[in-house]
Amino acid sequence: MTDYFALKERPPYFPERVPCHILEHVPQGFYLAKHEQRWALCCTDKKPIHIDFTDTLYRRGGKEYLPKAFKNMNGKRIFDATAGWGRDSWLLACRGFQVTLCERQAYLYTLLAQAIELAKNTPETAATAAQLTLVYQDSCQYLRTTSTQFDAIYLDPMYPPRQKSAKVKKEMAILHILLDDEAGDTAENLLLLQTARARCARVVVKRPHTAPPLGNQVPRYCIDAPNTRFDVYLH
């Protein structure tokens, strides 16, 4: 997606260097608009979506398999190369990791930037939000040019949702549209894995249980969750 739209005004969180068409009337397809005093991702046939890290759903307990993939590291710095809706990054930040989220899709970046600012200004979530750094860039390009050192890199290549809630399926479907269906074992995701492994000693890749390792690259070990697994690469 190369054209971006907003209703009435340009969102303050929208990436500065990206053009955004400001419209007076509701367009077809996706656009950003004010909804309940916050910017939301809207579409003519869908309910508005926004990201809210202050929601108790982000802070509730339960079995957490992802943090186990980052145990026994020398440091706490993680690069999330596929930020998306930010759920995994928020979970890791809640567990004390310093997370850099990288997102190249301007709509998603806008929602994430707004959510992080809101969380920083909310007492219950301020400390966790301070653990997050948001970057608007292609992840491969960022990893090749940044001087920042990371202790681990996390990848979540999209797959069609299975055995998930209606809301998760809806948000996954929207990600597929926004990111031009670049999911699964595409050349782009394989290049991202290669770049990540060259850049960092630990790389964690989220996979469906039924899927082979990304690019058939065998991990050192796996963390099994009910519907997914986390492949851990070390060197």
UniProtKB/Swiss-Prot annotation:
Main subcellular location: cytoplasm
Pfam families according to UniProt: SAM_MT (PF04445)
E.C. no: 2.1.1.242
Positions of S-adenosyl-L-methionine binding: R87, D88, E103, R104, D156
Reaction(s) this enzyme catalyzes, per UniProt: guanosine(1516) in 16S rRNA + S-adenosyl-L-methionine = N(2)-methylguanosine(1516) in 16S rRNA + S-adenosyl-L-homocysteine + H(+)
Subcellular localization(s) per the UniProt record: Cytoplasm
Protein task: Specifically methylates the guanosine in position 1516 of 16S rRNA.
Name the UniProt record assigns to this protein: Ribosomal RNA small subunit methyltransferase J
